[in-house]
């Protein structure tokens, strides 16, 4: 079993689990082609402890946790939507929108540090290299976007070069996000439809791109 802790930023390593993706077509194809072995697709989950305000500056184990997810393809943000006086919340109340904004801000701060390092490196060659100069302009555009409180994933990329560059930066705010509402067991039957916290979560979860 995995180690559990109800406190944010507990001193534990991430839990990593690999789950196979069910697909009925695999058996049919395996039988049709008389395959000796059928290997299903898998998804690797990296479960980190909760982040808190200041995580990007090292509060709790924030920097370590952020580093653990920088290489992932997508982020699943589990958001607390249940009331229980016996389960503490680091901010003292249940507010999923506030929690999401807190995490997003920490991801933005972390990405800005990545961009600053890249900008410093590219600046050294930008005067003599046209491609480097173009990338520098793009980096400044991303930086301004993030400093405006927006996620990188909401940016409109204009060229193939921009798409290629963005793919190399591993920005946390460029990754697709799934918000998973953590509800009480008695709310599972109606998918939390009567829970105002879930409804507010649905409201802000419009696709970004």
Positions of predicted regions on the chain:
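Short, small-residue-biased leader/transition segments that mark boundaries at the very start
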Residues: 1-6, 206-208
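Short beta-strand-centered segment that lines the nucleotide-binding/catalytic pocket of NTP-utilizing
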Residues: 7-16
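Short, conserved catalytic or interaction motifs in soluble domains
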Residues: 14, 21, 81
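Conserved ASCE/P-loop NTPase catalytic core
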Residues: 19-27, 42-59, 68, 104-108, ...
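Switch II of P-loop NTPase G domains
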Residues: 26-74, 82-97, 101, 159-168
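Conserved beta-strand/loop subsegment of P-loop NTPase cores
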Residues: 74-79, 102-104, 114, 118, ...
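Short glycine-rich anion-binding loops that position phosphate/pyrophosphate groups of nucleotides
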Residues: 81-82, 186
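C-terminal-of-GTPase-core extension/linker across diverse P-loop GTPases
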Residues: 121-201, 205, 209
């Amino acid at each position: 079993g995995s180690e559990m802790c109800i406190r944010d930023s507990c001193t534990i390593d991430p839990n990593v689990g690999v789950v196979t993706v069910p697909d009925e077509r695999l058996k049919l194809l395996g039988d049709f082609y008389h395959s000796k072995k059928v290997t299903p697709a898998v998804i690797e989950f990296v479960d980190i402890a909760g982040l808190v305000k200041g995580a990007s500056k090292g509060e709790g184990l924030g920097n370590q946790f952020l580093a653990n997810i920088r290489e992932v393809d997508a982020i699943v943000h589990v958001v607390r939507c249940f009331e229980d006086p016996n389960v503490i919340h680091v901010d003292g109340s249940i507010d999923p929108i506030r929690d999401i904004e807190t995490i997003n801000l920490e991801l933005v701060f972390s990405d800005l540090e990545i961009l600053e390092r890249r900008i410093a490196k590219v600046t050294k060659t930008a005067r003599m290299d046209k491609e480097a100069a173009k990338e520098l302009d793009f980096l400044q555009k991303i930086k301004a976007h993030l400093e405006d409180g927006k996620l990188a994933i909401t940016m409109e990329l204009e060229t193939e070069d921009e798409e290629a560059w963005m793919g190399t930066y591993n920005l946390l705010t460029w990754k697709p996000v799934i918000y998973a509402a953590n509800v009480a067991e008695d709310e599972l039957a109606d998918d939390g439809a009567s829970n105002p916290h879930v409804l507010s979560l649905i409201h802000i979860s419009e696709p970004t791109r």
